[in-house]
Amino acid sequence: VPVFADPPEWSSANSYEPLEIVIHKGNSYTSKTFVPVGIDISDPQYWALTGNYNAQVEQYRQEVSAMQGQVTAMQGQVTQNKDDIAGLKRQASDFDAEIAARKKVYVTYKDFGAKLDGVTDDSAAIVAAHNYANTNGIPIVQHGGKVKCNFQAEVKTSCLLDMEFVLLANSPQPVYSIEADDAQTFTFSGSVTADSVTSPDARLNGCFAMIQNENDGWNLGAREGTGTTIYHREVKAYDKAGMLITSPFYIPNTGTFTCSNVHSLWERPVEFAGATITYDNSEQANIPNFLRVRRNNTAVKDITFNPLSVPPAAASSLESNGLIFVHACANVKVSNISGNNNSSDNETTTASTYSYLLGFNSTFNCHVDNMLGVGGWGVVGSDWCDCMTYSNCVLNRVDNHFGAFGTYILTNSKLTGICAFTLPYGNANAVISNVDMFPRAKKYSCIDFRKDVNLAFQGTLHINNCTLNEPNSIRGNIFINAVKSVSSGSQPDVKPRIVINGLYYNTTRQLCYSPAGMALNYSINGFEGNFSMWGAPNVKMSNSICWNMDTNGLLTPETIIHIDNCTLNKKETTPSTDWFFTGEFIIANCKINNTFKCNTQDDQAKHLVTGCIFKNGETVIGRGAVSFVGCVIDTVPTLTHYKSKSCFGIADAEK
């Protein structure tokens, strides 16, 4: 068996036994036989080369070198791959950011650094949030938090702000302003007529516009003769084809018109919701303007107003100072508004007569729904509006201040406190239906015709299925306070019409009033309550029950009264009052119980009683003509002083 020599390194000075292995210059040699001293390693007689390691090592070295080259190349590739991966990561990060931005459906105030702790001034963050939202067309959503209103923000996207806002005495007004995307102002020359089917300027097509020009001929009312320039104002909406949707408010006019806040009727809808507003009103005489709306197709909802004090007794403001003010736009709905005032009682408070929670000016087709004005704050004001609807509300005043056109509706609501619904100049079709009225401020009329420019309401007032409960009323107060309009230039005096269809009237205040010379028309059906008249009304009443007939001695010779198919009573608790019917008085098909005591001093009076049942003998006194036709008379009435008395279809004994 071969064994390694000792030492293994070959030397010619050593002798070697057979089969000994030595190493020389990296190779291994094995002795074939005994090797004497002095034999060279290259002598093949004695040595056999058994291991050429240098060649193998070289081969290995070359292979390793090649592999190192490959490794180096691979390391370079890895480095490149790392760089590529880093680049891809950066691209992916950019894509992620872009995708996140595209997927972002809303932003919050806190995204822009707002603390919302009620102490920190978050004005810059809030304004920045709205600027970003307006630019990117995304809404703002913020749940929770409190902020002081030291800012003014322009809003063009929807906002859900379920948080508290503290209005300060020096808060900018308005705090929020919902604006149109591309509102324009321009002038044009031409004519604007009432029945136009095309817009006077192509730029108005498909737009809402507030149009005005100066008209010196419209100096009316208290301003007449002062030289003050009155603006001829109209609010219009045109469809895409250019057809006029609403007629001009005033006379046809030709000249140069200014169109302000012209913007598309089809602009993107915006919703503003959720805010709770706290305000201490003790330092101010009105409510500050928190939100202004000047954008079509806007919805404002779920707003709670918590004033910490009542307004001063001398409070006075226009509707533009209201908590929410809608101006120069169309199709706006305001809903679920609560005005909670814990420091006052809405049944008695009158201090907030002119401090509006909600105001409208120069609008078209707006709707207020579910507004709860608790604590004397339920006041709504409007100027120059076309088509207004109030529904499901609890209010103490609806002050339609100037210019009512189109349809004005108050329905399914309650009026209390001041309990007033005013109607200004205009030809609106006003409808009050399913409304409960509980007046607590006795000096106000429930329905008041304003005459701010000496022109009064000229439309039709419908009262349907309403109730009025006023147990402690004053007899001299008026339910409908009509005023006589005046003619001025081309503004004719148009007499309004009043239609009552279903009214429960538990009050002694005057029902039918007409100023002398106006001859206001009342058409009444389905009435029950105390019936009273004053002035010179023309009344046609049917299918009603009158507890007490009271004319207060104030009818004029122009009065015309037709009563048909009614029951006329006198309650034992009511004062003993005579009827003073002057003019034309017809009672037909009625049941008359202890009621008919009629006095008149007019020789021209004409009284006709036909188809009636008299249960108690009454004294009928007059100087004109009286006729009884086809009546059933249990106890014969006494007819005195009439210059002409006639009876037809009555039994001889009764005659």
PLM region descriptions:
Residues 35-56, 227-284:
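Small/polar beta-strand repeat architecture
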Residues 39-44, 113-129, 284-291:
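Short, polar loop/linker segments at the starts of domains and inter-domain junctions
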Residues 161, 185-216, 265-281, 292-308, ...:
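Parallel beta-helix/beta-solenoid
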Residues 21-36, 196-253:
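Ser/Thr/Gly-rich low-complexity blocks that favor extended beta-strand/coil architectures
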Residues 97, 109-143, 193-203:
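Acidic Gly/Asp/Thr-rich repetitive segments characteristic of extracellular carbohydrate-active
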Residues 1-76, 82-83:
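Tryptophan-rich substrate-binding surfaces of secreted polymer-degrading and adhesive proteins
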